[in-house]
Amino acid sequence: MRVLFPLLEEEIDVSQESLVSDVCASIGLPLNLVCGGKGRCKKCLVNVKENGEMKEVLACQYSVSDGMEIYASREQAASQILETSSNSDLPFDPIVKCYSLNYTDLVTPMCTYDLDVLRKLIPQTIDTPDYSVLKHFSEVYFLEGYERLHVIVSGNRIIDFIPSNEKEKPIYGIAFDIGTTSVVGYLYDITSGCLLNQHSMLNKQIAFGGDVISRIDYAGEGPESLHKIYEAIMETLAEIITQVCKKASIDTKDIYQTVYCGNSTMAHLFLELNPKHLGLAPFLGFCKDAISLKGMDTPLPINPKGTVTFMPLLGGFVGADTTAVLLGLPRDKKMRLMIDLGTNGEIAVGNCDKYYVASTACGPALEGAGLTMGMRGTTGAIEKVGCENGKITYSVIGKTAPQGFCGSGIVDAIAMLFREGLIAKRGNFIKGDALDAHPMKNRFGVDENNQRYFKIVTAGENPEGKDIIITQKDVRAVQLAKAAIYTGCCLLSENYGIKGSDLEEIVIAGAFGNYIDVHNAQFIGLLPKIEGVPVRSIGNGAGTGAQLYLLSKEEAGICNAIPRITTHIELATDPKFVETYMMNTMFGDNVMI
């Protein structure tokens, strides 16, 4: 059965029972299945042409038919992904190195061993290689016609020998930050420490759900489902590897080291380990240590003898992305609160001696998902909202007609509504005399479900002629998300034994944290506002940490030790959780416990 993608000028063969969302994912267009393909979120609406009739369908519920045309585009799947990180001057002493030796120096004296000669020529400790490497060594040691023997070493272990007439052999590595929504890869020449380029794209696992719980549920359906979601992340990584190598004009087989960070669910799915027990109390994973594989153990297009390392996890849903962020923080006694404003809402408090960490399960609302007109940070998303002299102002990604709100836009919009007296401290839209007296009263409306909404952009203001609204339900979703984050900050600090006034810096990590208006976030009670305590955004802190691990043997060792100074706290078991959480659903700059 043939299915066509006119906007891509492509067509593919599919099986009869395929869903539109599955077909889109197979061609590299993973749609935003926030609800895990259950048909509830309605974020995967797509136009199709079937039997000559154009219609809008839910991709996760609608089956393809022969000759169907699906009008999905790369832009529909593209989003505003943060690639930049805060460190530009990274230390350089990589785990993987290349030593280039002259064949003329490989002279074995009487009654000695070739490997001992090699060890004397390499200025570091060399352990006995694996059998396959030792066998390869015996084959290349006496080769004629070559001037140089390049020896690739990972840690203290030789992983490859390359006979050559070239004086030097450049080798490359990639540091990856695997997010629930997006994946970023940084390509380095690890003979020089030079960043060559970087590339990002959506995590193709988004076709199986927009959050970790949806993906845990899907993977837990059986081995076939687990393998499909494993293949999705491998395809994502393979595309990034191919793209960065193409841009740098290098062979993917010259990639000898890759390093990965991501939350605990991403780690399990990367390793094709069933994450079922992560989704059930007491939220246990298989292993939190750094895990190393060989390239040949994966379908990734790197050198099969190269190293593949997933950084260590910290406990529960707090994974290697948080470990990576902590690795990139200054190693001093300054007391910090670190907040990663993503779907899992990881939080850490402490200093270089001791950290407490927790995840807050704040949901996808702060990333624009799960809202009536929420969307990823892509073209058409409102990213900034304000009000000047009674007139609502906004800016749109791509400077096009507005389609909905991304995370930073929804925070600004809620702050504006609260500041202008359009919602009360408890989150209710105003009504009665307060509504009648308000100059923006005509922007309110009621939908078919008798739910009130407010028009941030009216149909008359929008070139596409549609209202862009925030409903009462959307306000509640933001209240729950911000309460989760703020409660996490309060209880984690209390468990650590400090008050808000003891903090010396608040650090915001992640893509959303980089785009958010900090003052608006503090105004609605999403972020703590503590007098004299600065708030600093570090961009993609997880990406910085992954690069540190790639480029420095010492940093990798420090990273592997972070779990030993870190205590994971399960916030939901704290006796104060419910009371604190309910208090923090209120809008306003709350006071930390």
UniProtKB/Swiss-Prot annotation:
It comes from Eubacterium limosum. One of its GO terms (molecular function) is 2 iron, 2 sulfur cluster binding. It comes from the Bacteria. Its cofactor is [2Fe-2S] cluster. Induction: Up-regulated during growth on proline betaine or L-carnitine. This is Corrinoid activation enzyme RamQ. Pfam families: RACo_C_ter (PF14574), Raco_middle (PF17651). Transmembrane segments: none annotated.
